[in-house]
């Protein structure tokens, strides 16, 4: 992997990530045109730069990223836009840096959630429900789901797209630091 490749991806990804962050913060939605378009662009850039091996690398990284958010998506703790954005960023990052990328995104997600909890911008009802669904076999899931604020309520959702963007930038910066 060359230094030019990392700089190219950083320059290419930055405006796209800023656009998705703004969309997620304002409307708590990540548009399909941005997420699926980003996934296609990531695979195209990987294959254009590295050929078939790059395409395979990007595709595997995207699949691992989808698998990473699959359980949170299934228990409704993450949205489909988050899954698609993570897959797109994984396609750009590539297989080699995927573990670092997923750890950076997780840590950034924790920081964003704590920040929003401290500023009282988000409620803990969804988080409590998710943990009780996972770890408490006696928990009444129907009653718990009824206590969660509606999905369109601003306080019910954390803009995880911001955490994905921060984790992507952190991974690219780590990659740049390792090359110098």
Range-by-range predicted roles:
Residues 1-180:
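A membrane-topology feature that recognizes alpha-helical transmembrane segments
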């Amino acid at each position: 992997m060359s230094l030019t490749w990392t700089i190219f991806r950083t320059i290419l990804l930055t405006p796209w990530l800023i656009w998705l962050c703004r969309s997620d913060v304002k409307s708590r939605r990540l548009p399909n045109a941005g997420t699926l378009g980003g996934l296609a662009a990531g695979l195209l850039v990987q294959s254009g730069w590295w050929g078939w091996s790059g395409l395979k690398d990007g595709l595997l990284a995207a699949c691992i990223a989808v698998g990473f958010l699959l359980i949170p998506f299934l228990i409704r703790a993450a949205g489909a836009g988050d899954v698609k954005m993570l897959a797109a960023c994984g396609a750009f990052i590539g297989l080699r840096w995927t573990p670092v990328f997923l750890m950076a995104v997780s840590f950034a997600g924790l920081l964003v959630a704590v920040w929003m909890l401290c500023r009282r911008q988000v409620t803990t009802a969804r988080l409590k429900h998710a943990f009780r669904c996972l770890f408490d076999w006696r928990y009444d899931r129907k009653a718990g789901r009824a206590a969660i604020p509606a999905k369109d309520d601003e306080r019910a959702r954390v803009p995880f797209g911001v955490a994905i963007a921060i984790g992507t930038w952190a991974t690219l910066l780590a990659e740049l630091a390792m090359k110098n």
